[in-house]
């Protein structure tokens, strides 16, 4: 959010969380975008498309730094928190799980390491023959996900058969517990059809940002001071909610 302040006084101001600062990010097309002002951080309910809470910070504040403060402001905790890969940090996964919710966040490849033995490069468990195992659903009461033998599930025709790995008629099966790796082990499991379906709902956040910028004067703000900017953005959010009620 750009605010019209004398930026030549920037060197005289402290980065204390209240003064305007330069912000930088890449847009949806990968182009660099800079602005001088503040940044609005929102939590949006994907069903209504309306905000549940927000914070305002100087523009140089990283988005991920406001994830936990926003969660703490929530009156009711949702089932899922959907965030983009900029929020891919272990402290955020842990905070979400402590609140009894699930984090649906794409992996930031810069944070990745070589997968442990028994996992492919997508962090998907493989059997002793190297075949990806079949996802068999989440077990919420155990905070775990279950995988089964791809041969007995009819996904692969393993020439060794299922007895190679297990004496069970169902073949080899395994559980992964979220507490062991909350970043990679999600309920539902990362990159399954259900996981992708849930993540797609995150578009509600971008739509709301676009709406208040284009229609409610949230983009260029002609006032100074964090408290005034916060009040202005609160009015933008409130106006959007009133319009939503009227248009029902």
Regions found by a protein language model. Name each.
Residues 75-76, 116-117, 122, 126-128, ...:
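Short, intrinsically disordered/low-complexity patches at protein termini
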Residues 1-98, 102-108, 113:
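Polybasic low-complexity intrinsically disordered regions
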